[in-house]
UniProtKB/Swiss-Prot annotation:
HAMAP family, alphabetized: HslV
Active-site residues, Swiss-Prot/TrEMBL: T6
SUPFAM superfamilies membership: N-terminal nucleophile aminohydrolases (Ntn hydrolases)
Official protein name in the record: ATP-dependent protease subunit HslV
Annotated binding of Na(+), by residue: G162, C165, T168
Quaternary organization: A double ring-shaped homohexamer of HslV is capped on each side by a ring-shaped HslU homohexamer. The assembly of the HslU/HslV complex is dependent on binding of ATP.
Reactions the enzyme catalyzes: ATP-dependent cleavage of peptide bonds with broad specificity
Highest taxon, organism lineage: Bacteria
GO cellular component terms, semicolon-separated: HslUV protease complex; proteasome core complex
InterPro entries: ATP-dep_Prtase_HsIV_su, Ntn_hydrolases_N, Proteasome_sua/b, Proteasome_suB-type
Taxon lineage: Bacteria, Pseudomonadati, Thermodesulfobacteriota, Desulfovibrionia, Desulfovibrionales
Length: 185
């Protein structure tokens, strides 16, 4: 039986980026297997954030490959993402992986899809997973109509997603990167 269900959200503002992921792991459509999973991680000397949605084993495979690309390209997020996407499209094994990654540094947010696409959102806000549309909508509304910082926006938007998506809970992992090099967890 497949383990699935999550929400990952990233928001960029003038000071940097914040990324959050919920902690719920669901088996099938009805059984919560874990409440405190950590789906957002720091990569490449704590300068890159990455979150995953989809099959857990597949996501860890992608994390490993993405981290190797970051090392290969000196932490260049966009180059590492594009090179991983090329591999993803070419490799018969990778094409079968059922996962997506949301990756960010202090300047850029990218979505890496299971079809090998690399998408940079126009507005500095991106979400993946079952609760992604809810979190994305809430984050856009908060960003447009308030002066909240990125971390507060991701926390509030994830709370909305948790209220609406049965595969998303309120146990959050939140990571931030500041443009000046600072980071918080």
């Amino acid at each position: 039986m497949e383990l699935k269900g999550t929400t990952i959200l990233a928001v960029r503002d003038a000071d940097g980026v914040a990324m959050a992921g919920d902690g719920q792991v669901t088996m099938g459509q009805s059984v919560v297997m874990k409440h405190t999973a950590r789906k957002v991680r720091r990569l490449y000397r704590d300068r890159v954030l990455a979150g995953f949605a989809g099959a857990t084993a597949d996501a860890f495979t992608l994390f490993e490959r993405f981290e190797a690309k970051l090392e290969e390209f000196g932490g260049n997020l966009t180059r590492a993402a594009v090179e991983l996407a090329k591999d993803w499209r070419k490799d018969k094994y990778l094409r079968r992986l059922e996962a997506m990654l949301l990756v960010a540094d202090a300047e850029t947010i990218l979505i890496l899809t299971g079809t090998g696409d690399v998408i940079e959102p126009d507005d500095g806000i991106a979400a993946i997973g079952s609760g992604g549309p809810y979190a994305l909508s809430a984050a856009r509304a908060l960003s447009r109509h308030t002066t909240l910082d990125a971390e507060t926006v991701v926390r509030e938007a994830m709370a909305v997603a948790g209220e609406l998506c049965v595969f998303t809970n309120g146990h959050l992992t939140v990571e931030t990167l500041r443009r000046n090099g600072g980071a918080t967890t």
